[in-house]
Amino acid sequence: VTNIERETKMSGSSHSKGVLTLAGFLGGQFAQEKPLAVSAQLTFEQNYGGVDGDSASSAELYALLSSLADVPLKQNLAVTGSINQKGEIQPIGGATEKIESFFDLCEAKGLNGGQGVIIPNQNVDDLMLKEEIIAAVEAAKFHIYSVKTVAEGIELLTGMNCGKREPDGKYTQGSVFHKVQQKLEKYNQSIEAAQIASSQHMDDNASEYEED
């Protein structure tokens, strides 16, 4: 996984560590039998001021999983939270401020009952929210979801089952992780076919050289 912010020296060490961690998670979930046959690039479009902190690492992972699975993510939910290589969501700073900022944006556009924020479970007890937000949550006009794992987050964002690894190494049929696994297997097959074709081409050239 290429962190474009890091390559352009616009990423702090904490953000770079978060990207490396999500790459480790992907490897642990989908590269137990074969290496990951995929190259991905992450960037914050039209960002010119630099990026630091790992609180976006869970959102970055969800975006990668969405792309690999060809499954769209809900755009009415904001996400914050860092991850570890086990797929556990870890606490972040400024949770209250992040919720309030997204709430203000949603309120300005009009609350429709579908908007909300996904935060780490460990941050729940530290929230100091405005009465206005509490009232909106109680009225089901705005939602705050706490998650402990990547699996919980991806299910909220897609409305689909994340999937569990079966004894045969495959993920649950039709799940998000199963779709990711299928895409990666397709990439592997394409690479293997290209390697075979390249090897055959080299053998043919060698045979022609010997005949000459």
Regions found by a protein language model. Give the residues of each.
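Peripheral, non-AAA+ core regions of ATP-driven protein-machinery
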Residues: 1-10, 14-212
